[in-house]
């Protein structure tokens, strides 16, 4: 059957005072191209702080009817005493190089919360109750929800990765996101204003949204993901050292290299 076009309605900026030109307008991402005459991804920027204009979140949305999410375990993280080394190459498999659109960071180090992870039946870290879980089914669908909602269907999952509590679930912010920043991590100085990344899914299950926020508290990252269209969203990681989103292309020698980053100075 013919797939429907990939378009998203523009969204109003969260706050008129901090909004910048182009906020909330979805535009195709040339680095990932298109298929069937349709873009594979759309991009927008939002300024979720009511006053500050330096607090911004860049959101990229992927059409999951034309692309798929894969999880690759890191060479060292999440640290595990049970998973086979064969499961943690820390590299995108060569078989996927020709169709690779982008790669981005996963979640916290295992020692920071002991959030669970599983890949192809190998459990790196046991699941933790209350943790937000990004699950990829064996058919390629993506679910983002608290572990309690995913656990019953875990046999259907090819991979799952846990994070701190969902920033946003079923369209509602987490009850602690406005005041309990520690759940989602702080800077070395103990401040909540830091770079953060998030991954969400829309109500249809078709649109995967990745957000990268600069100088952003958890509540403002949640707001940006919600405004962009996420029904549920998980924070992935924090700090400048661990947040990444790279677009790739092959060089003259046929080797993959970073073509561009989602925002400057990510490599």
Question: What is the role of each PLM region?
Answer:
Residues 209-211, 216-265:
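C-terminal soluble interaction/assembly domains
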Residues 60-62, 199, 219, 245:
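Short beta-strand element of the conserved SAM-dependent methyltransferase core
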Residues 1-125:
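Zymogen propeptides
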Residues 1, 184-185, 255-256:
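Short, structured coil/loop segments at alpha-helix boundaries
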